[in-house]
């Protein structure tokens, strides 16, 4: 498990046809469609609350905390129309949150705030599988060394 920092962003509808992942710094024009309006933020907030392990944050933020077997993840919605996802976790809960929110609004992408890459559902799933393979390899090596 690693510390993960993401933001969920709206992209222009034509961007959904682009090849993901891509780096925002390499785009000649912004693929982002701007901040979420309050009505959409409310719908995303409600959808997040339907996730397993989701509990309303008690720290005054409009946020959810997911305490999963794979780690802890916070999802919060800001008054300026942003959505942030961060925590110490595997990528599986991040994918679950993103997939749930895509059901509400299909014009979403996940921005990795550490690398600057923008992911759609398929590229994030590839990243999840790669992450799982690394973990499996670590356990295989450890088991082989112990034998």
Language-model features: locations:
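Acidic (Asp/Glu-rich) sequence patches and key acidic residues
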Residues: 1-147
């Amino acid at each position: 498990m690693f510390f993960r920092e993401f933001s969920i962003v709206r992209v222009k509808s034509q961007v959904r046809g682009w090849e993901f992942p891509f780096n925002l710094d390499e785009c000649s024009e912004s693929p982002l469609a701007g901040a979420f309006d309050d009505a959409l933020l409310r719908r995303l907030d409600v959808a997040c609350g339907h996730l397993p392990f989701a509990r309303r944050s008690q720290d005054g933020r409009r946020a959810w905390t997911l305490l999963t077997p794979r780690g802890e993840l916070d999802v919060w919605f800001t008054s300026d129309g942003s959505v942030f996802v961060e925590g110490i976790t595997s990528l599986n809960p991040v994918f679950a949150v993103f997939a749930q929110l895509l059901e509400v609004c299909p014009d979403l992408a996940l921005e990795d705030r550490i690398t600057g890459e923008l992911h759609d559902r398929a590229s994030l799933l590839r990243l999840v599988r790669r992450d799982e393979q690394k973990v499996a390899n670590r356990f295989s090596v450890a088991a082989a060394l112990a034998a």
